[in-house]
Amino acid sequence: MKIKDLNKYYDKLQLEYGEPTLSSIYNGGCENNPDICFVFMNPTGKNVASTKEWKGRRSPWIGTKNIWKLFYNVGLIEKELFDKIQSMKATEWDEEFADYVYSKVEEKKFYITNLGKCTQIDARPLPDSVLKQYLELLYKEIDIIKPKKIIVFGNQVSTIFLGKKICVKSVRKEEFKIEINKKEYPVYAVFYPIGNGMRNIDLAIEDIKYIMNK
C-alpha cells in the first residue's frame, strides 16, 4: 500500500465530517523513513489547497505562515524559503510553489500530517469521536512511512494517538512508545503551536530541538 492509496478514505470521511464545500487535506514530505513525523490536529479553510479550484497537492499548511515559523526556528527550512513564505499572501501560493516548499520538506527528511484530515471552515474544535475515525488510517500512514520519531501536538491529539490521558505540560520531553504492525516507535507530545497555542510556540520549539538532538 502507498500513501496515496489512503486518500480515497479521507475523501469519503470529508463528506461525513468536513465542510462540504472544501476538500480533504492529506499529508506531505519525506515518505521513506523520515527523521520526524509531525502529527497536527485537522486542517481548516485557511489552507488554500482545500478549495475545489486547487489542482495541486493537498498537503498541510499551504498558504499559511505561522507554522513555518516553527519549522524555521527548529532548523527544518532555510531562511530564504522562510522569508519568501512570510512575504506572501495566501492567494499568492500556487501549485508550483507548494510543490517547491514540500520538496524542501522532503529534503530535510520530515513529514507533516494531521490526525483528522477533514477540513473545517474554521478552527472550531472537533470532538474526540470524529478524530478517532481517522486513528486507524493514521496508524496505516505511519506503517507505510516508518518514521524514526513521531511528534504529536496538543493534549487532544496526543491522548487519542497514544490511547492514554496526556497533559502536554506534564510530559514535556518524555518519550512514549507505540507499537504499530509489530514495530515500535518513539512518540513525544508537544504543545500545539498554532491559533490559541501560539503563546506556547517557544516551548514547542525548545522541546522539538531537544527531541531532534536526542
Task: Name the predicted role of every residue range.
Residues 16, 172-214:
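A hydrophobic alpha-helix/topogenic segment detector
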Residues 2-149, 155-164, 168, 185-186, ...:
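A polyanion-binding, active-site-adjacent surface
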